[in-house]
């Protein structure tokens, strides 16, 4: 009985080691040693819509760091993976250009310990105007005071299922509103007429 238990323990250990050895770190990302695909982390503006099954682990024993990789439901696993924090990794050399997306839906989310969708924008005219203002407008400066309401707009495209392109929406006490990307620190003043069409709850 003890021999069987020991064999089971050894097999479990080998499985864990094998899984953890699948990914190696590189100067620019992670290498899947089984498929020989190299994945690079995208900017925080890109998020996985959900997390599927685990595909591998990178373990840095020296620093005690572990990164677990997962497939993204409905997304092409040969191109995109995610981790336990929802970060997106891409096997392509070039980051997706969200300005070229045919955006079909925008989730309006409240961000706290978890992200909760409070509204859903499916009106094509509103979606197109949000995209136009964000991608085509000149950069502005955020007000110095804190926003009274903060939402995260998650844009979805049928061309990239399972993946969101995200920007923040800040509403201030004086009624002004801004789109904002925390990674690039790009801020865009939202026209009042458009702000009235963005549901906050």
Residue positions per predicted region:
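Positively charged n-region of N-terminal signal peptides that target proteins for export
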Residues: 1-10
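Function-determining sites in protein domains
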Residues: 20-201
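C-terminal motif of bacterial Sec signal peptides marking the signal peptidase cleavage site
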Residues: 15-18
């Amino acid at each position: 009985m003890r021999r069987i238990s020991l064999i089971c323990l050894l097999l479990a250990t080998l499985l864990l080691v094998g899984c953890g050895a699948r990914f190696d770190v590189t100067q620019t990302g992670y290498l899947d040693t089984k498929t020989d695909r190299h994945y690079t982390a995208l900017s925080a503006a890109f998020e996985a819509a959900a997390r599927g099954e685990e595909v591998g682990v990178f373990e840095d024993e020296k620093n005690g760091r572990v990164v677990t990789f997962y497939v993204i439901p409905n997304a092409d696993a040969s191109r995109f993976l995610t981790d336990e924090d929802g970060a997106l990794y891409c096997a392509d050399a070039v980051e997706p250009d969200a300005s070229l997306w045919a955006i079909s839906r925008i989730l309006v989310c409240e961000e706290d310990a978890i992200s909760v969708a409070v509204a859903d924008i499916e009106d094509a005219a509103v979606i197109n105007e949000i995209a136009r203002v964000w991608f085509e407008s000149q950069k502005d400066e955020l007000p110095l005071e804190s926003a009274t309401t903060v939402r995260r707009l998650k844009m979805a495209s049928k061309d990239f299922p399972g993946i969101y392109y995200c920007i923040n929406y800040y509403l201030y006490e004086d009624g002004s509103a801004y789109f904002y990307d925390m990674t690039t620190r790009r801020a865009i003043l939202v026209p009042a007429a458009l702000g009235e069409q963005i549901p906050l709850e």
